[in-house]
Amino acid sequence: MSDLFDYLAWRGDIPMSQAPFNPVDGLILSILSYVHFDNLVPPDLRGPISLGKAAETYLALPEGRRGRVRCPSDRKLLAALARCRRFSPLGLAFAQDRFVPEEEMQFAAIAVLLDDGSAFLSFRGTDATLVGWKEDFSMSFLDAVPAQQAALDYVERFASLFPGSLRLGGHSKGGNLAVFAGALARIKVRDRILAIYNNDGPGFTRLVLDSPGYQELLTRLHTFIPQSSVVGLLLEHDEPHTVVRSRQIGLLQHDPYSWEVEGGSFVQAEEITPGSRMADQAIKGWLAGLSPQERSQFVDSLFQLLSAGEASTTADLLQPRNLQAALRSLADDRDGTRRTLAEGLIQLARSAASVWRENVP
């Protein structure tokens, strides 16, 4: 069972001028935006730094001075890319990282300048911040969340400065941002988009799916989901998807390092698992039973509870003082948080039970 690192060992010494860009390259560059390069990559197109140089500089920094990564495998990938003739010479530029709690925005992107004269715009998925997670949940009732608008602005600004063709991509929320930005970009920009890679990213509201830009890009959208996908089936999708085999189980299949690779392609599975299909039906049934206002109230109540203490990340939630603060807030319940959450969770349980009865003899 080969993975991304096996792919780099096999194909890493062959430049893209000899072996064309493929979906596995798209996933690798999508993951790259999870690395917090901080000031190593310029915020504009003046003086791009090579991927190899950026990686070497980043990895040479003392542990306490390195920017964050999503997981240790991201650093391992960065080290492998620095040694690869296929990736090391590529330019990095136009880095943007915006975290604005008061706007409930978590957004980051980086441009990778490919050796064929095109660029790959990589959008970061959700990080560990509660702000980022709340923004994701808000996609269930907003036609556009702040990060989606930021992604569109990013693509438009980059395209105004860069004359070549474009590829867009991301993992998880990053894949959603790539599709959103491509679909709503001006037609002169859309015409330059060669492909968009959505790696297990959530879907959209009908406003986006019915837009002329989305419909126009359908043949250029490449959506990949693992067998037990949950995130990649959220909300609505009109584009076809490819089901990828993973070495993990359940929700852990969202990890792109678990996806199986063969040559320059992913190893395909025939279909998603029954568990994935049932989870999708339960969530969609639950959301269908809630008005946009009810969804908004549920999300606000949930994250008000989670942030009752000093928690700002998912890891903070497990600290005793933050758990105690959340429990006190739930017990106090002056603002009706407990009732809102209880009603929402009861409806979710009913939806899940209905799906179970329909699918399990």
Locations of regions flagged by a protein language model:
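Alpha/beta hydrolase fold serine-hydrolase catalytic domain that processes acyl esters and thioesters
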Residues: 1-24, 29-110, 114-119, 123-138, ...
